[in-house]
Amino acid sequence: MDTTNQSEDIKPCDSDLMESILMFDEPISDILAHNKLWISHARTRSNFFPQEGRHISNQHTEAATSLKMWMLSKNLVVIVKRKDDIFPCKILTRNPENLFVARFLESGKEKHIQVEYSDIIMTRSELEKALPLCQHLIPARNWDDFYIIRDFEKATPYFEQGLSALVKPGQQFELQLEDAPDFYVMATVVKNYRGFLLVEYQNFKRWIHMLSPYCHEIGWGKNEKQEYLKRGPYNRHMNVDLVAGLVKQSTNQKLGAVPEIVFRNNCPVPHRIPEYSACVYLDLDQKRFYFAHKVTTKTCRNNRHFFNISIGKNLVTSKQNNRPYEFHVYHPRILPYSVAKRMEVQIILPPDVKLLPDESNLDGYLRTYCNPCDKHKTSDRVQPSPKIAKKKNGPLLLDDTPDAMFRSRPLLGDNIGAHKEWTNFMNHIPDYKRKDLLKSMDTLKFCEIFRPTPTGALQLTAAEVTGQQECMLRLKVSGEDEPVYIHNADPHLYHLGACLDMELAINFHGEFFDEKPLKKNKNANNGFSSF
């Protein structure tokens, strides 16, 4: 089934505008009663059947986790000391009280046991004494997962606190600008809604999640710049500069900086995406998908961490400064074509692509934009012999030149964008929980989402889940006619009932609901509801 299409309505523009909002809309006087009415409607519509929600809004779940559970993640290798018994182990699962680990034995095997958080060595001095006694037990393949002791020393004072509770109004951190990541500013926290932060720098305000890759500890930018200049452009560091004139001291000097440990994982990772690699792009309104490809522009100083994309001839630009927008490899609105195809969504093709006979839209786009040297191409990475006219279960082989068999097709795989975030999330769930999650995913019927209003504010809005597959949801949003697509880990997506936790009025209308209760999806495949 070919679900792609051509359209002349192409407006490639992106700036994460929803992150640049001054305030929430809260027009309801009795917020609590209004929100309870929404919850009652949703539960009645779902026949009071429990909803599965572990696979969505994982950034908010992570921000609410205690620091000790957040840092001691699955597969992390630590050193444990029980009286005179010192041994290394790998974390399997954890709960608020204790940990279930795999102890490495002299025989090379593993023994599953339970340990307390207090049993783990968390100071450098103790580790230096203990490690020589047991390091020979750690398999070579597990050394990459060995814990970083300096991070645990920094975290010790906050170990029992929730992660989001460490960020308080008045504290400061360094914020890398999303529409110009070559620059960063000193930002002050104004509000904290369970990790979703309103921050200000000089006269500007912006919403951003505390676990965004653009949030960093004080001193990050200076250190990053120094390491970049010392090691050269081909390293993991970035060429960033502080925006002049925007340094503003905190109004509450007692609060100072956000604890450094909060941002330990917040940095865009380097990528190796080849030029002209094709992907699918979800627009800023989150309603339309476009064929797109990776390009490099002169405005992007950090090409190892960020890249630009183009929809045909049109660069995706920032609405705020018309500068080519710079994406990181896990950006939630970039999808592999294979995922979009499985979702069976319409993918818009630029109007200047002229399809050849029996040519798919994907092949037409690749031929037109992704390798100017080729007249024809297919979407296959490894080409069969040019004598073969058609590949089984694949597109036509249109290039009959002798070197066609050696050309690789620039089509991005699953390790990018929203799908990569989904994969990382699923890999950290124990096997027995993962199977249960996949079976029950189709019970998710309602959620809450921040949507921009005509006045330029964010409004927490009611939404009904009309389809889901892998890393994406399709939503029917109150007050909007077209479906909205959103990545499971998008920080604007919340569980049902978040309005009560944050005490924000939710936007919903009675006509949004069909009076009939929802029925269970009979077409669900292993817990996935097809779009």
Swiss-Prot record:
<dbReference type="GO" id="GO:0030334">
    <property type="term" value="P:regulation of cell migration"/>
</dbReference>
<keyword id="KW-0805">Transcription regulation</keyword>
<dbReference type="GO" id="GO:0009952">
    <property type="term" value="P:anterior/posterior pattern specification"/>
</dbReference>
<dbReference type="GO" id="GO:0003682">
    <property type="term" value="F:chromatin binding"/>
</dbReference>
<dbReference type="GO" id="GO:0002119">
    <property type="term" value="P:nematode larval development"/>
</dbReference>
<dbReference type="GO" id="GO:0007411">
    <property type="term" value="P:axon guidance"/>
</dbReference>
<dbReference type="GO" id="GO:0005737">
    <property type="term" value="C:cytoplasm"/>
</dbReference>
<dbReference type="Pfam" id="PF02820">
    <property type="entry name" value="MBT"/>
</dbReference>
<keyword id="KW-0221">Differentiation</keyword>
<dbReference type="InterPro" id="IPR004092">
    <property type="entry name" value="Mbt"/>
</dbReference>
<comment type="function">
    <text>Probably acts synergistically with sop-2 to maintain the transcriptionally repressive state of homeotic genes in order to regulate various neurogenic identities. Specification of some neuronal identities also involves expression of non-Hox genes. Specifies dopaminergic and serotonergic neuronal cell fate, and regulates neurotransmitter choice and axon pathfinding.</text>
</comment>
<keyword id="KW-0804">Transcription</keyword>
<keyword id="KW-0963">Cytoplasm</keyword>
<keyword id="KW-0217">Developmental protein</keyword>
<protein>
    <recommendedName>
        <fullName>Sop-2-related protein 3</fullName>
    </recommendedName>
</protein>
<dbReference type="GO" id="GO:0040015">
    <property type="term" value="P:negative regulation of multicellular organism growth"/>
</dbReference>
<keyword id="KW-0524">Neurogenesis</keyword>
<dbReference type="GO" id="GO:0005634">
    <property type="term" value="C:nucleus"/>
</dbReference>
<dbReference type="GO" id="GO:0045892">
    <property type="term" value="P:negative regulation of DNA-templated transcription"/>
</dbReference>
<keyword id="KW-0678">Repressor</keyword>
<dbReference type="GO" id="GO:0048665">
    <property type="term" value="P:neuron fate specification"/>
</dbReference>
<dbReference type="GO" id="GO:0042393">
    <property type="term" value="F:histone binding"/>
</dbReference>
<keyword id="KW-0539">Nucleus</keyword>
